């Protein structure tokens, strides 16, 4: 297994618990004589840290691994910045859910030691890339680990749009919006909209309409290498938005085209050896426990 010597730390701002965990993590890594680099925004709220700092954009170039302290949202932001560097990312959960940041703070030293000793799993999670075009010209571009969402923004009116997959017309829809999600994002917004849960190893994309004005509107799962095109109706009088992971936003105009496809670079997500995807789903989604007398 790959050995890690240069460790980057990213932390969610605005949380005392995150800062406490970052300090613990820093001490633990330094005690192992590792080179620690702080992302510059978290470094600003840790006076006297005495460590090298780096912008998030450059962190992937100087680190063997990056540890994210925060919730799933923190890891989503880190993933978009770090995927192009092919640097592994490990998450310590200081959020409310923790689908992606799966190390609990109370097990920080034990689990991080296992990873640093070479005992870990690596998952390659693909991202989506979205581009908004107007009159043939690109006006916005963003990446997403979870989902690309077309939504009305501040308006409460429905959106009319057409969907094309690999150049073939699929359907027109009138709905509150459309979610295009990766397997990683299938347990996020897409799940709330009635989409299926997809195992992270699947090479597939799910298209989930949001409150479609029809009884036949259902999610569609397509090949992960598909190119999706969403055309906003020219007859619209509102200006909907496109959001990537709920963090990057672009305003669309009637007639705009949104293209969504798989990003070439993938996120290398690290887990401890005892990571179990179904246990995560069972714990986070409140699935029932094993019945007495059930199978092993």
UniProtKB/Swiss-Prot annotation:
Its cofactor is a divalent metal cation. The active site is at residue 72. Keywords: ATP-binding, Cytoplasm, Kinase, NAD, NADP, Nucleotide-binding, Transferase. Its main location: cytoplasm. GO terms for biological process: NAD metabolic process; NADP biosynthetic process. It is an enzyme of class 2 (transferase). Involved in the regulation of the intracellular balance of NAD and NADP, and is a key enzyme in the biosynthesis of NADP. Catalyzes specifically the phosphorylation on 2'-hydroxyl of the adenosine moiety of NAD to yield NADP. This is NAD kinase. It comes from Pseudomonas savastanoi pv. phaseolicola (strain 1448A / Race 6) (Pseudomonas syringae pv. phaseolicola (strain 1448A / Race 6)).
